[in-house]
Amino acid sequence: MITSIMQPTFLPSPIYLSLIYQADNFVFLDNVQFSKQSWQQRNLIITKNGPLWITLPVLRKKDKIINKIEIDNKNKSIKKIVDSIKFAYSKKKYFSQYFPELEKIILKDNKLLSNLNIKIIKWLCKSFNIRSNFFYAADLVDKIGEKD
């Protein structure tokens, strides 16, 4: 049995999804400290003008763990992120098949960054028929050492 663990990232790479694909169990490492300007809240997209960083706006308080970081839903840059993705990829082959749902997930009033990232990751896994048992590290802390 293979178990993998990673922090929930914003718009994960194919390598991230491959890690889930190869695992029987996947743990979202959601109980570690948030790192500003990390893959947890941003990613690169490729535009006709070159790479572009897209960053989710968050309400950050010092020394917060990932699963406590709130998204700044009043910030208009969330819509700009969706528009940037649309502009960069609208002519790609499978865009119309996947973008509408991604847009809904991102634009929904998501309170916590980790929840948004996990929603995206689980949606991608479902879309690509990637199956694994998902767990949250924060839920496992109290269970360390327990046996079934």
Functional labels for PLM-detected ranges:
Residues 1-148:
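Residues lining hydrophobic/aromatic ligand-binding pockets adjacent to catalytic sites
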